[in-house]
Regions:
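Mixed-charge interfacial surface used for oligomerization/domain docking
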Residues: 167-221
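Glycine-rich oxoanion-binding loops at beta->alpha junctions
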Residues: 59, 68-99
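N-terminal amphipathic/basic leader segments beginning at the initiator methionine
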Residues: 1-50, 194-196
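Short glycine-rich or small-residue beta-strand-to-loop segments that form or flank ligand, phosphate
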Residues: 2-3, 49-56, 72-75, 101-110, ...
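Gly-rich Lys/Arg/Thr-decorated short loops/hinges at beta-loop-alpha junctions or inter-strand turns
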Residues: 1, 45-54, 63-76, 140-143, ...
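Short alpha-helices
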Residues: 135-174
Length: 221
């Protein structure tokens, strides 16, 4: 296991985000921090399509590290390996969304899809134009493996960048031009179909203060 400096495992995400915001002048916290862990751009442009992403913490620089020009307008951060709440996602949508609308970029995990999806539906009831794209790029879990199918991994970054560049250029339908995704069903949810990632690790992971979640086998002669 790698060594980490933690004052308190229970406050690790809050302290990490505080340090990040203090060292990056272009971002700030949304009102309600730390109960609502949302990092937004210091100056939000509501004349373009807004991009919002997020998920469980523990995979830095995701997601706050991708907030900035030509990228995300807001990152919604959950606890370690835990999805952010519906209330936090909805607060982010409300803060950054103008008349051009908002795109939620979500990785294919059950909690993320559920909470971002519920927040999107509530935002629509408030009259906001919200779309959601799901990134499922994991080569290790092709269908029918895995309960929820392919996970969303590092390929999500390319979706951030493609959609972010289109939004910054003023494209009115950045989710179509940046993501090249096809519509699925009647839930305003698209799936990014052309990104694949094979992930590997040299060490196991574990939430702060807990044992490793699994053991890597070692090769012997």
């Amino acid at each position: 296991m790698g060594h980490k400096f933690l004052n308190d495992a229970g406050a690790a995400v809050t302290e990490m985000l505080e340090g990040f915001v203090q060292s990056h002048p272009g971002v700030k916290f949304l009102d309600g921090f730390p109960d609502v862990k949302v990092v937004v751009r210091s100056h939000v442009d509501k004349n373009k399509v807004a991009l919002v992403s997020g998920g469980g913490s523990g995979h830095e620089p995701a997601h706050a590290g991708f907030v900035g020009d030509g990228m995300l307008d807001a990152a919604v951060c959950g606890d370690v390996f835990a999805s952010p709440s519906v209330a936090a996602v909805l607060a982010a949508i409300r803060h950054v969304t103008g008349s051009p609308g908002c795109l939620l970029i979500v990785k294919n995990y059950t909690g993320d899809r559920l909470n971002f999806g519920l927040a999107a539906e509530r935002a629509k009831l408030e009259g906001l134009n919200v779309e959601m794209v799901v990134v499922a790029d994991d080569c290790a879990l092709p269908p029918p493996l895995g309960v929820a199918g392919r996970r969303g991994l590092a390929g999500t970054l390319f979706v951030h960048k493609c959609a972010g560049a289109a939004a910054a250029a003023g494209e009115p339908r950045s989710w179509e031009l940046g993501v090249r995704a096809g519509r699925e069903g009647a839930h305003s949810t698209s799936k990014c179909r052309h990104t694949r990632v094979a992930a590997a690790s040299f060490i196991t992971c574990g939430a702060g203060g807990l044992c490793a979640s699994f053991v890597l086998c070692t090769m012997v002669d």
